[in-house]
Structure formats: structure tokens, C-alpha cells
């Protein structure tokens, strides 16, 4: 007899292998079997405290089962830190929409999504929206999309334009803010004023991600305490050098990956 965790709950079992265990539990050959964070149908010897999941394909697991699966995928300590993280994304265009989706998929527990704009056709070349979203506020469309990816995280939306007046009150309960504006003026305003009001919060900005070409020129740099910039610092959007999906996504990946690293290392 050994004790394992099955779908997030402790269970005593006499079965010695995963095949014996799942064939006794699962009545549908299409069910997904997950052992210690990995989906597999191989026959593996079971050990004390193994984490096992049997999930019906094409259905949403209950909240506790999904949470337990993500803990197994990420390792428990990391998952708990991400789940307790509070992150704001400012600007929900090509950068911000993908940053928010990355963080939702990773299990960040609270997202504050801020933008004033609506979705229009020119956004579709790089932003995480669909034709069916045209005319919707980006905040509302992105919340709807994220709710279909991870319905168990908390999402707050603010459909407004950030300025020096409202900046001082928007991020009082936020650990990390991702700046993802299109406007150079808005970027400068955020970089110059954010730490006047939030000395202990982290700001991650973006600069230089337009065009195509060298992927590795996009880097993450620490500029000062609690202040980071992702991008190549050179290629801004301009006439003849527009924003294109691949490099925008690379930069969004840098920003969202840095969020995970910072939350993981948070004391």
C-alpha cells in the first residue's frame, strides 16, 4: 500500500504501476493520463507521493484538479508564487495582449488589464484578437479570451487611458507592471513617473521591436532597481518599418518570462 495524490487528493493504492492504476480508474481510452506533470500512456512504476491525474478529454477539469495539475507542471512552490502574483498590463495591443495570455496560461493569479482602445482591422496583423472581436474594447475582448483559457484566475479590466493624474492610483496593490504602449509619449510618461508613486513595485518596459530580422537582438536589460527594458533599444515603429507579429511576440515573451522569473524569486 502506498499513498499517492490523484486529481489533487490523497489516495491509498495497492497498484504498483501507472497502467494498473489508470486502467482501474479510467473507463475511457481517450482520457488524458498525467504522471508528475507529464502526459503519458507509458507503464511507469509508481512511488510514494506521486501525483496522478485522469482528465476526460475535451472537458474543463474542476478548479481544484486544474490547480493541482498546474502545480505538478510548474512544481508546487513556483505555482504558488505565480498564483499569488498580481500583475498589470498597460496597453493591450501586440505586446500587451500576448503578455496577458502568456501570464494567464502560466497561472498568474490576478491580472489587471488596461487599455482605452477598440479593436480595428489593422490590429489583426500582430495582436491576439480575431475578426469576431472587431469593434470591441480590447479590455473586454481580451478578458473574454483569457476566460476561455484559464477561467479560474482573477481579471480586472480598466477601459481608460493612463495619464499622470490617474497613474498614481492605478497600481497600489500590484507587484509588477508591464508597459506595452504603442505611443512613445505614453512610454516616456510611464518610465519617468511610475517610481515616483510605486518605489517598491517593478516596471517592465519595451523599446525596439519593430520590423523583422535578428531575433536575438531583442534582450532583457535591468536599467535600475525595479526597472527593466525588453527590446533591441533601436528599432522603433516608423514609416517603412512597421510592427510585425514575430518580433512583437518575441518581445512579449521576454516581458512575460521576466514576470515569471521575478515572481519566482520574490521573497
Where are these regions (language model features)?
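Short acidic beta-strand-loop surface patches of small beta-rich interaction domains
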Residues: 7, 31-46
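Glycine-rich phosphate-binding loop and adjoining beta1-alpha1-beta2 segment
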Residues: 115-150
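Glycine-rich phosphate/adenylate-binding loop
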Residues: 23, 31-38, 56, 172-176, ...
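Eukaryote-biased recognition of intrinsically disordered, low-complexity regulatory segments
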Residues: 1-11
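Glycine-rich adenosine-cofactor-binding loop
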Residues: 78-115
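A structured beta-alpha segment of the ubiquitous adenosine-cofactor-binding alpha/beta core
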Residues: 139-174, 181-183
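Short amphipathic, charge-patterned alpha-helical segments
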Residues: 15-27
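N-terminal charged helix/coil linker that caps or initiates catalytic domains
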Residues: 42, 47-48, 53-86
Amino acid at each position: 500500500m502506498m499513498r499517492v495524490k490523484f486529481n489533487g487528493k490523497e489516495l491509498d493504492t495497492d497498484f504498483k504501476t501507472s497502467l494498473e492504476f489508470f486502467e482501474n480508474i479510467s473507463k475511457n481510452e481517450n482520457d488524458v493520463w498525467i504522471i508528475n506533470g507529464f502526459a503519458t500512456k507509458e507503464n511507469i512504476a509508481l512511488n510514494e507521493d506521486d501525483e496522478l491525474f485522469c482528465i476526460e478529454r475535451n472537458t474543463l477539469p474542476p478548479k481544484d484538479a486544474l490547480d493541482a495539475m498546474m502545480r505538478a507542471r510548474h512544481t508546487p512552490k513556483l505555482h504558488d508564487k505565480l498564483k499569488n502574483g498580481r500583475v498589470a498590463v498597460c496597453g493591450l495591443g501586440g505586446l500587451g495582449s500576448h503578455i496577458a495570455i502568456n501570464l494567464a496560461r502560466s497561472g498568474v493569479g490576478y491580472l489587471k488589464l488596461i487599455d482605452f482602445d477598440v479593436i480595428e482591422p489593422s490590429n489583426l496583423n500582430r495582436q491576439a484578437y480575431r475578426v469576431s472581436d472587431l469593434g470591441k474594447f480590447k479590455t473586454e475582448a481580451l478578458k473574454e479570451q483569457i476566460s476561455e483559457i484559464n477561467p479560474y484566475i482573477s481579471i480586472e479590466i480598466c477601459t481608460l487611458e493612463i495619464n499622470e493624474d490617474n497613474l498614481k492610483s492605478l497600481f497600489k496593490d500590484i507587484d509588477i507592471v508591464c508597459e506595452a504602449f504603442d505611443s512613445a509619449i505614453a512610454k516616456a510618461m510611464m518610465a519617468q513617473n511610475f517610481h515616483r508613486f510605486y518605489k517598491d513595485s517593478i516596471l517592465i518596459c519595451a523599446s525596439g521591436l519593430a520590423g523583422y530580422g535578428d531575433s536575438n537582438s531583442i534582450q532583457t536589460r535591468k536599467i535600475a532597481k525595479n526597472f527593466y527594458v525588453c527590446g533591441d533599444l533601436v528599432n522603433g515603429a516608423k514609416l517603412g518599418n512597421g510592427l510585425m507579429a514575430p518580433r512583437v511576440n518575441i518581445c512579449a515573451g521576454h516581458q512575460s518570462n521576466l514576470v515569471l522569473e521575478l515572481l519566482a524569486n520574490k521573497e
